[in-house]
Amino acid sequence: MAASSSSLLLLHKPTYNFHFAASSVPTYINSARFRISSSIFPLDRRRRRRIWSVSGFKSMADLVKTNARRDGEDRFQALEQEAFISNSSSELQNELVSDAGDGIEAIANRLSKWIVAALFGSVLLLRHDGAALWAVIGSVSNSVLSVALKRILNQERPVATLRSDPGMPSSHAQSISFISVFSVFSVMEWLGTNVLSLFLSGFILALGSYFTWLRVSQKLHTTSQVVVGAIVGSVYSTLWYVTWNSLVLEAFTSTFSVQIALFLVAAASALGFAVYVLLNWFKDDR
């Protein structure tokens, strides 16, 4: 009987399960557990805090440095852009001004021969006498003298690529000086010495000097080439005018054959000059 009751007791499944909830655990056990864990691992928590604080400080410092570097680079790029824009605008303005100045001088240089030729033609038409015929011959012979001197001296131009022919003396300066001096002599002969004649003479000489200076500014001749051309043209014009008054005028007024000869030579010279203009001046203006 006792054996059977003990076997039933062993095989009997208990009706209640006893377990403690988290809230039912005594508080002193939890606090003790917390104290144990915190007392066991105090260094790890401090190290983690220090590591986090150091890494956080480093990351913040790196972030500040990166932002500062980016701000500095952005400001530097902005300054570079502003400097580039300002330099570009100033260079563009300088180029526009220089191009405008060079364009005006280039146009004036191309028109100079036409203006001087028109001035010379006007003087010849106003004179319409033997001195005008003599001046035509002198102008053409002055140009021939310039070509001969160029071949003899054979001095290169300042920029050989612009013109291949020699530059000493300047044929433009020599021709302009010849015509300017002859025009001044004609004005003084017509009007005498007064305020008007002096003003016109000064204007003619100033215009001729400006046109000769353009040959230097356009790098077609050196200063010495222009000065030599101006001196040769002025001296040749003076001698040509003096020769007319001292020698040719008397023979022209007294001898008909001299008049015919002078007229034919002047006509041939004018025709040759016209052919030269058609072959060279229009080609240079293109």
From Swiss-Prot:
pH relationship of activity: Optimum pH is 7.0.
User: Which keywords does the record carry?
Assistant: Chloroplast, Hydrolase, Membrane, Plastid, Plastid inner membrane, Transit peptide, Transmembrane, Transmembrane helix
TM ranges: 133-149, 173-193, 194-214, 226-246, 260-280
Give GO terms: molecular function aspect only. Answer: phosphatidate phosphatase activity
Organism of derivation? Arabidopsis thaliana
Location of the transit peptide in the chain: 1-60
The record's gene field reads LPPE2
Which E.C. number(s) belong to this protein?
Answer: 3.1.3.-
The name on file for this protein is Lipid phosphate phosphatase epsilon 2, chloroplastic
Q: Does the keyword Membrane apply?
A: yes
The UniProt disruption phenotype note reads: No visible phenotype under normal growth conditions.
Which InterPro entries does its entry note?
Dolichyldiphosphatase_PAP2, P_Acid_Pase_2/haloperoxi_sf, P_Acid_Pase_2/haloperoxidase
> Localized where?
Plastid, Chloroplast inner membrane
